[in-house]
């Protein structure tokens, strides 16, 4: 992997961890972008992937500002396209992804966390999109994903001020899904992964698709899409296995 700044390991059957390890703050430059692509390639067989950090005090601190200050507009746009590309790949992955956030998740770091299916944040975590303080806007999905998680008003508050949101407030507004003691985000994310691994991954992915569609489709179309997803699961055999396992009082053997 690129400069070994993203390390993938198997934590348990079907569960992988991709650890960011680019001192001092996991700046999301090309090494981490390329490293994430490589890690996702290696995690192709996993059902759940946890994104974590080994850098104390940081999940990821966004773009490499020192480097970005030296490039022209074309190069800056190309960098943004590459960052959005890996985050969009993460968001569309055929698995459940969990961001385990201890410390700061700022700018692209928060955008990385928001691209995951779920977010576990520790009490020491802080979140922010401070791009307006640099004369920019969040450009790797932040303006689109944050309102979906916390609503328009809260999203504007966070983005227009560029302030850092403490973990307790982030949990209350829905920016993170589970709040855990400081230093335990990765452990808690792996425990959550253990809960998730027992269910049908195709059904879980269908839930994500259907919930995401709720933001874009009129209600009646959303209902129809829900029925379509359920029918596909029934025809695929996932539902048949789940129902049979329930009646036979045994763990399901999902594909």
Features from the language model and the residues they span:
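A structural preference for short, pocket-lining loop segments at secondary-structure junctions
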Residues: 12-22, 31-71, 89-100, 122-126
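C-terminal long alpha-helix characteristic of the crotonase
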Residues: 120-125, 176-224, 231-237, 253-255
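Glycine-rich phosphate-binding loop at the start of an alpha helix
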Residues: 62, 80, 84, 107, ...
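CoA-thioester-processing core
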Residues: 86, 90-92, 100, 106-160, ...
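A short acidic, glycine-rich active-site loop
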Residues: 70-81
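Well-ordered beta-strand positions
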Residues: 118, 157, 161-163, 169, ...
